[in-house]
């Protein structure tokens, strides 16, 4: 009963958003200086000492989010539950995206049951959640 109430609560508070993928976020060795949330007071290097994407908690469930305006955004390191066809993954926002979410292909494959390449871009629901959902 509690589980179904939690799922219904998530669904009722979620908003629709576009989700695509970029294989740059799949590169564990890519330096965090390549993303908007690199350094500065809100940067992931500054806050956690991570130097590359593979060190990020929850990797490869990372990506860009349109709510991150650019370098040192207060939205850096926020966690989102993204739901597609009843499947939810949690993604840590590490970069700016022009439209919705642009996440690692591996993360989108987890979200779409291996269909990221075939689908390319999807409409999903999302909600900001506690960072503990993203391994922080």
UniProtKB/Swiss-Prot annotation:
Disulfide bonds join 37-76, 79-134. Keywords: Disulfide bond, Secreted, Signal. The keyword RNA-binding does not apply. Residues 1-16 form the signal peptide. GO terms for cellular component: extracellular region. It is found in: Secreted. InterPro entries: Cerato-platanin, RlpA-like_sf. It comes from the Eukaryota. It holds the Pfam family Cerato-platanin. Induction: Produced during infection of wheat leaves. Belongs to the cerato-platanin family. This is Protein SnodProt1.
């Amino acid at each position: 009963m509690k589980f179904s109430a939690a799922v219904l609560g998530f669904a009722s508070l979620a908003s629709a958003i576009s989700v695509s993928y970029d294989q740059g976020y799949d590169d564990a060795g890519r330096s965090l200086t390549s993303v908007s949330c690199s350094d500065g007071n809100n940067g992931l290097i500054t806050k956690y000492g991570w130097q590359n994407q593979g060190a990020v908690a929850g990797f490869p469930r990372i990506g860009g989010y349109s709510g991150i305006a650019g370098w040192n955004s207060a939205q850096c390191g926020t966690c989102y539950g993204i739901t597609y066809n009843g499947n939810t993954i949690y993604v840590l926002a590490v970069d700016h995206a022009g439209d919705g979410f642009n996440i690692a292909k591996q993360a989108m494959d987890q979200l779409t049951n291996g269909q990221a390449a075939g689908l390319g871009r999807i409409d999903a629901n999302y909600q900001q959640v506690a960072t503990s959902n993203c391994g922080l």
